[in-house]
Design a protein with these regions (language model features):
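Contiguous alpha-helical segments
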Residues: 182-187
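Short helix-coil boundary/hinge micro-motifs
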Residues: 1-144, 151-155
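Cys/His-rich microdomains that often coordinate metals
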Residues: 149-154, 170, 175
Length: 187
C-alpha cells in the first residue's frame, strides 16, 4: 500500500511520540526534551514552551497510544480506532489546506494553522494520517514490538506487512540472536 510522503512521515512521528513513553524511548520529561524531539521530527510552527504545552503533548501521546492498543485487539479494533481518530479530529477542529514550505517543498496537507497550539497541530496531522491508514483498510500496520521485553509501537510500512520489531532498542537483533543460540543449544 502506498501512502503519501507526508502521511508516512506523520505516522512515523506519531509512532515516535508514543514510544517516547515506552521501553527504550526518550521520555519527554521537560521542555528541553520536547524541543529536542520536535527538532528531530521536523515540527515547525508555534511553540509556547510552557508546562501547559508539555502536558497537552503528553495527553496527545496517551490518546495515540490508545489507538495503537486498539489496533492490536482484533475484533472491534477498527471501530475503536475510528472512534478515537474521529474524536481527535473533532477536538483539534482539523481544517485541511494545501501548502508547501522549504522543509517540505512538495504539496502536502496541513490541518491546522502554524499559529495554532502545538498539540492541536500535532493531533490534527496525526489523526488525519491515521484516518488515511484506516480508510485504506491498513489498521493492522499499527503494531507493538514482538520482543517479549519491549512495549514499543511501530508503524509497518513494509510492502508485505512483515515488520515485527521496533527501532528503539535493537529488539530484532536480540530476538534473532536468542533464536540462533537456542537452535545451537538443541544440536
Amino acid at each position: 500500500m502506498h501512502f503519501s510522503h507526508d502521511t508516512q512521515l506523520t505516522l512515523r512521528d506519531a509512532c515516535a511520540l508514543v514510544n517516547s513513553d515506552r521501553a527504550h524511548g526518550r521520555p519527554l520529561a521537560d521542555q528541553a526534551a520536547l524541543d529536542a524531539f520536535l527538532d528531530i521530527q521536523g515540527w515547525t510552527g508555534r511553540r509556547d514552551r510552557d508546562n501547559a504545552e508539555l502536558a497537552a503533548v503528553h495527553a496527545l501521546r496517551d490518546r495515540l497510544g490508545a489507538i495503537w492498543t486498539a489496533a492490536g485487539r482484533g475484533a472491534g479494533a477498527e471501530e475503536d480506532a475510528v472512534a478515537a481518530v474521529n474524536a481527535l479530529l473533532a477536538d483539534t477542529h482539523a481544517a485541511p489546506w494545501l501548502t508547501r514550505h522549504p522543509e517540505m517543498p512538495q504539496w502536502h496537507l496541513h490541518l491546522a494553522s502554524p499559529e495554532d497550539p502545538l498539540a492541536k497541530r500535532m493531533g490534527a496531522e496525526m489523526a488525519m494520517a491515521l484516518a488515511d491508514l484506516i480508510r485504506a483498510g491498513e489498521l493492522r500496520r499499527l503494531k507493538t514490538c514482538a520482543a517479549p521485553d519491549c512495549d514499543a509501537v511501530l508503524i509497518d510500512l513494509s510492502r508485505n506487512r512483515s515488520r515485527m520489531f521496533c527501532d528503539t532498542g535493537n529488539c530484532g537483533n536480540r530476538q534473532h540472536v536468542a533464536a540462533y543460540r537456542e537452535r545451537r543449544r538443541e544440536t
